[in-house]
Amino acid sequence: MSRQVVRSSKFRHVFGQPAKADQCYEDVRVSQTTWDSGFCAVNPKFVALICEASGGGAFLVLPLGKTGRVDKNAPTVCGHTAPVLDIAWCPHNDNVIASGSEDCTVMVWEIPDGGLMLPLREPVVTLEGHTKRVGIVAWHTTAQNVLLSAGCDNVIMVWDVGTGAAMLTLGPEVHPDTIYSVDWSRDGGLICTSCRDKRVRIIEPRKGTVVAEKDRPHEGTRPVRAVFVSEGKILTTGFSRMSERQVALWDTKHLEEPLSLQELDTSSGVLLPFFDPDTNIVYLCGKGDSSIRYFEITSEAPFLHYLSMFSSKESQRGMGYMPKRGLEVNKCEIARFYKLHERRCEPIAMTVPRKSDLFQEDLYPPTAGPDPALTAEEWLGGRDAGPLLISLKDGYVPPKSRELRVNRGLDTGRRRAAPEASGTPSSDAVSRLEEEMRKLQATVQELQKRLDRLEETVQAK
């Protein structure tokens, strides 16, 4: 009698652990807008989530450790004039976040260490060029100040945030219909897109050329998502002709047939994929679902291996995914999600059970650090580079907020890009006002530090 051989994997027993109530963010008003983005973005310093706002669009930014009940009057980032659809933290500066909105603009914001004391209405730069709502913002993985945006005008724009100027535009001739998803390759040389015309495309954005494309990776009519995974492969999620949800793995050089195609269930929510290149695990989270499925990708058939599923009682309205440098390596945490409920944000830690408290080198290979590998000019000139890697053996401490190198460039770019209008203040007046605002922010931060020290003294007594 033959025995079934169980595949060996150190990730077979990964389990999800939701945070205790006092480690959640309570009483937050998550946006009711219908849009298939995660509505949440996190990094080692902050958690940001798109919230309900009257008279415009807003999102909430909280220091990661500021858990518990969130005051209903907590200051928000509220410069958009219509609902915010997508947010993304800069991978090279934990204090910088980009937002795309129904008001057709992309805005880039700087968040002070310690979080917001007052509502933030003025972005560092506003990027204008789309003619319809902007539903996707995505930072370049390794080049400094390079930001991509995709709008419902079927246009992708790549911006140099340091100048406020559009470097590249991929028009409707590339995508004739709504763009569902965009993902950068690990070295930032290619982008992978999915579109309402039922095609997945791999594009060299600097040349504007489609390197490869697949028509109907999934037969259903619902939206498809596509992301780069391990070397030379992409992963897609979509629906069958019978409306069953599917996940598929493809070789980018041979897109005729998938390496693996698995049917999951008959739920209607679009599956959002999150890929970890350090472990080759992909996590699938669906809006309206109450579960997170995870799979391991290997270089040998059958290539895509189901590991397990984390389930809870309440469905999710959105999901944020922590970069590897924000995890607790001493607890063997290999991923952390921030699940949005209707009035709450709940961290969920994905952990590999290990008996030893020592650093587990096999779980934590060198990972992408916060420093860019290229400048925007180098990338535009044709250079590609993988991320600069760091070790997590001694843990990761986020650096203190430093004056952004993009600030001066952003201000100049904003003045250069904006049309001259009668009655607008001079550049000298603008500079003086900005300097005063910086001084006021510094004063507020100093007063907050004094207040914190005073509270510590009172508690000690």
Curated annotation (Swiss-Prot):
Region of interest (Disordered), residue spans: 403-432
Modified residues (Phosphoserine): 2, 422
Cellular localisation: Cytoplasm, Cytoskeleton; Cytoplasm, Cell cortex; Cytoplasmic vesicle, Phagosome membrane
Tissue expression profile of the protein: Expressed in brain, thymus, spleen, bone marrow and lymph node. Low in lung and gut.
Post-translational modification: phosphorylation at Thr-412 by PKC strongly down-regulates the association with actin.
Coiled-coil regions, chain positions: 424-460
Phosphothreonine: modified positions: 412
GO molecular-function term, one example from the UniProt record: actin monomer binding
Pfam families, alphabetized: DUF1899, Trimer_CC, WD40, WD40_4
Disulfide cross-links: none
Keywords attached to this entry: Acetylation, Actin-binding, Coiled coil, Cytoplasm, Cytoplasmic vesicle, Cytoskeleton, Disease variant, Membrane, Phosphoprotein, Repeat, Ubl conjugation, WD repeat
InterPro entries (UniProt xref): Coronin, DUF1899, Trimer_CC, WD40/YVTN_repeat-like_dom_sf, WD40_repeat_CS, WD40_repeat_dom_sf, WD40_rpt
Modification sites for N-acetylserine: 2
GO CC annotation, single: phagocytic cup
Main location: cytoplasm
Family note: Belongs to the WD repeat coronin family.
Function: May be a crucial component of the cytoskeleton of highly motile cells, functioning both in the invagination of large pieces of plasma membrane, as well as in forming protrusions of the plasma membrane involved in cell locomotion. In mycobacteria-infected cells, its retention on the phagosomal membrane prevents fusion between phagosomes and lysosomes.
Self-association state and partner proteins as the record states: Binds actin.
Clinical disorder: Immunodeficiency 8 with lymphoproliferation: A disease of the immune system leading to recurrent infections, and characterized by CD4+ T-cells lymphopenia. Patients can develop B-cell lymphoproliferation associated with Epstein-Barr virus infection.
Protein name stated in the entry: Coronin-1A
UniProt lineage: Eukaryota, Metazoa, Chordata, Craniata, Vertebrata
